């Protein structure tokens, strides 16, 4: 394994860690950074490169699980744990905590069902540069609409005030985000905001709901494709995983700290700029044709 290839693995892990849970579409960034630039399939082989992306995604998912470890233990009624960062002290004293396992399950159902039904179709027909650009752009517009609406909401709800109906609707939007480029977090956070949650609450629920789904999906994919991992490539996988996990920890904590302040529009603008950049490379220079 050449040093340059290990560096490429670290770069891809960093990109995955930065983008998996941000509302900017990790798929769009992987197409730009890997398929159009680093081309891991050329030195790993297409199947092994696909497996590598599963591994680094697991790195990001483990990072989110670690950030929300106390909340997950609390939902599962294991021990005594602190509140989710950002909840209001007076609200915690005046009413019992409402977020529970049923909220998470209700939110997971739509994406789980549609994932089982359409995963193969989506993987075969929708993972192209033009379809990802459409997802990036439409998702950006949806985020802008959500932010404009949220400005009119006087008392947005915290994550512990979420209802089962709100959880279900947010879950439906997670299913819609199966369209590559749309962004799971962009879709669900926007929907949560439209359902009168504050941005931090919508983000908290998005990540809490996404972790078990992504662990299951990535875990099953890895079980299907683990035989594609070559012994010589293991350092590549380890470095990519560690990069995704480490950067993911920093990115998720930073995002949750800032989201109530900066809202979604800056991410939407970034997505539109990204679409323009990818379009120039794809249509103007033919980079990425055949993906």
Curated annotation (Swiss-Prot):
It comes from the Bacteria. The chain crosses the membrane at residues 1-21, 48-68, 102-122, 126-146, 162-182, 203-223, 231-251, 267-287. It catalyses: di-trans,octa-cis-undecaprenyl diphosphate + H2O = di-trans,octa-cis-undecaprenyl phosphate + phosphate + H(+). It is a multi-pass membrane protein. Keywords: Antibiotic resistance, Cell membrane, Cell shape, Cell wall biogenesis/degradation, Hydrolase, Membrane, Peptidoglycan synthesis, Transmembrane, Transmembrane helix. One of its GO terms (biological process) is response to antibiotic. PANTHER family: UNDECAPRENYL-DIPHOSPHATASE. Catalyzes the dephosphorylation of undecaprenyl diphosphate (UPP). Confers resistance to bacitracin. Bacitracin is thought to be involved in the inhibition of peptidoglycan synthesis by sequestering undecaprenyl diphosphate, thereby reducing the pool of lipid carrier available. This is Undecaprenyl-diphosphatase. It comes from Staphylococcus aureus (strain MRSA252). The gene is uppP.
């Amino acid at each position: 394994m050449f040093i340059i290839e290990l560096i490429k693995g670290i770069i891809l892990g960093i990109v995955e860690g930065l983008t998996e849970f941000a509302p900017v579409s990790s798929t769009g960034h992987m197409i730009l950074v890997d398929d159009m630039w680093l081309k891991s399939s050329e030195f790993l082989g297409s199947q092994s490169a696909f497996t590598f992306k599963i591994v680094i995604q697991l790195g990001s998912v483990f990072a989110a699980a670690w950030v929300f470890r106390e909340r997950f233990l609390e939902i599962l009624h294991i021990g005594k744990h602190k509140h989710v960062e950002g909840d209001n002290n007076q609200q915690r004293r005046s009413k019992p905590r409402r977020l529970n396992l049923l909220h998470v399950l209700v939110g997971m159902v739509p994406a789980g069902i549609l994932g089982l039904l359409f995963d193969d179709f989506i993987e075969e027909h929708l993972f192209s540069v033009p379809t990802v650009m459409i997802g990036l752009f439409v998702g950006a517009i949806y985020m802008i609409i959500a932010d404009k609406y949220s400005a009119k909401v006087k008392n947005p709800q915290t994550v512990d005030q979420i209802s089962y109906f709100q959880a279900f609707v947010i879950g439906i939007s997670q299913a819609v985000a199966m369209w590559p480029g749309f962004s799971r977090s962009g879709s669900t956070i926007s929907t949560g905001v439209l359902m009168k949650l504050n941005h931090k609450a919508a983000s908290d629920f998005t990540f809490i709901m996404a972790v078990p789904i992504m662990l299951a999906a990535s875990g099953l994919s890895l079980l299907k494709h683990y035989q594609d991992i070559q012994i010589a490539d293991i350092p590549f996988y380890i470095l990519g995983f560690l990069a995704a996990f480490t950067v993911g920890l920093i990115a998720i904590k930073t995002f949750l700290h800032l989201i109530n302040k900066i809202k979604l529009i800056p991410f939407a603008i970034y997505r539109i700029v990204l679409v323009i950049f990818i379009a120039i490379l794809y249509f103007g220079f033919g980079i990425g044709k055949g993906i």
